[in-house]
A protein has these predicted regions:
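Ankyrin repeat A-helix N-terminal signature
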Residues: 19-24, 56-62, 90-96, 123-134
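Ankyrin-repeat-protein effector appendages
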Residues: 2-16, 106, 125-157
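N-terminal segments that cap or nucleate solenoid repeat domains
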Residues: 3-49
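A generic tandem-repeat structural signature
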Residues: 75-99, 105
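Conserved ankyrin/ankyrin-like repeat signature
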Residues: 28, 64-65, 98-99, 132, ...
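Hydrophobic packing within well-folded, soluble alpha/beta domains
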Residues: 29-32, 54-57, 66-69, 88-91, ...
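Ankyrin-repeat boundary/"N-cap" motif
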Residues: 11-17, 43-53, 79-86, 113-126
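Ankyrin repeat domain, specifically the short helix-to-loop turn at the C-terminus of the second helix
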Residues: 33-39, 67-75, 101-109, 149-156
Length: 157
């Protein structure tokens, strides 16, 4: 019985961290990460996409949340379950150039393909063509900036 309570407490913290990353709630995120830094690499068990906090911050365009997660050891190479995409693929897809720059500086591989065969550059270029507008509030300029940064680091389509 005790193990189930421990598991429930862990899942609650993971859910809270993902929610904090989505909102950019740095104080709440810092509190959780200070209590258990392993949370930075905890896959959501309530999101069917199987995301990590860094994916959520990327999707929401929460640059400072992404920076905090990296400070606490978030892995840049983890992939979600739905698309098997790294965080760089997520930020490129959602048109978040500031986080693209951050992940590239942290050593994220610019040519990793997701399960659909798309690279981060391919994701960003899809945004410049307007294909992802229904998923993101990014501007076409944001997608162009993201694509140029990825291309400059050797990203391929």
């Amino acid at each position: 019985m005790e193990l189930s309570w421990v598991r429930l407490a862990w899942m609650t913290k993971v859910t809270e961290l993902h929610a904090g990353a989505r909102r950019g709630d740095l104080p709440a995120m810092r509190r959780l990460l200070e209590s258990d830094p392993k949370l930075a690499n905890a896959r959501s068990e309530t999101d069917a996409r199987g995301t990590f906090p860094l994916h959520v911050a990327a999707e929401a365009g929460q640059t400072e949340a992404a920076r905090l997660l990296l400070e606490y050891g978030a892995e840049i190479s983890t992939t979600d379950l739905e698309n098997e995409a790294h965080a760089l693929g997520w930020v490129a897809f959602f048109g978040r150039p500031d986080i693209v720059e951050m992940l590239l500086a942290a050593g994220s591989a610019p040519s990793q393909r997701n399960k659909h065969g798309l690279t981060p550059l391919g994701c960003a270029l899809g945004g410049t063509e307007g294909r992802w507008r229904k998923f993101s509030d990014a501007s076409i300029e944001d997608w162009h900036r993201a694509a140029e940064m990825i291309r400059a680091k050797g990203g391929v389509e």
